[in-house]
Amino acid sequence: MRRNRSVVALSGGADSATLLYLAATECIDLHALSIDYGQRHIKELECAKILCDGIKVPHTIIKFDLTVFGGSPLTDKSLNVPAQSENKQSSTVVPYRNTILATLCAAYCKQYNLNTIYMGPTHEDLANYEDCRRVFYDSLQQTLRLGGTVHDLVIKVPFIDTEKKDIVHLGYTKLSVPYEKTWTCYEGGDKPCLVCDACRERITSFVLNGLQDPLVPDYDTWKRLEESIIYKD
């Protein structure tokens, strides 16, 4: 059986960064692959590169334009990114993004003689994203084995049953993940918007660990956010 030679599907977000650092402890040969699919939050790719440079992991960015399909505020700037309070998270789905990403990772595995793909769906993702279910990845793994030439290909999804707060706990206490070098916000600004679903989930994960998000350095702002999470009911 081949040793674990892997590629991480890397977005540059907090969960993804933790996945990268976890994979680095398990692999003898590790690469990272990101997609520039026309996302408005392109800053995440800058963070992905910084993360990989920091631990000397080869990083490739593939341009694969998904804006032609429209329908998601992540790729269509004429649409507003919904605040979490609007309960419209399903509108942020980018159709078949994870299928495309996994397929590109499989092709990368063939090129570089790798046999494992790490992807980062989490427990919270299951509510809104059909392509974050375990059955999806089990089926996709079999499809990629049958349709390609890496017949022992494995898709690892170590966080699929893990809550985001526990991912941050792992990254902070065990892996020393530099969360200040990550980007989660769906907006494309210089600072996180603090109201979109991605921001609120990130903030909650830090609050529940008794930590201050390094992307929100202002103490008063953080305390207000913390109280909004703790006393939201």
Task: Label the predicted regions.
Residues 159-186, 224-231:
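Short, charged low-complexity linear segments at domain edges
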Residues 117, 186-191, 211-219:
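Charge-dense, low-complexity polyampholytic segments
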Residues 200-202, 206, 212-233:
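Short Fe-S-cluster ligation motifs
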Residues 145, 209-210:
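Short alpha-helical linear motifs
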Residues 125, 206-207:
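Glycine-rich nucleotide phosphate-binding loop and flanking beta-alpha elements
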Residues 103, 183-204:
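Local cysteine-cluster metal-coordination motifs and their immediate loop/turn environment
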Residues 1-175:
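ATP-dependent adenylation/nucleotidyltransferase module used to activate substrates
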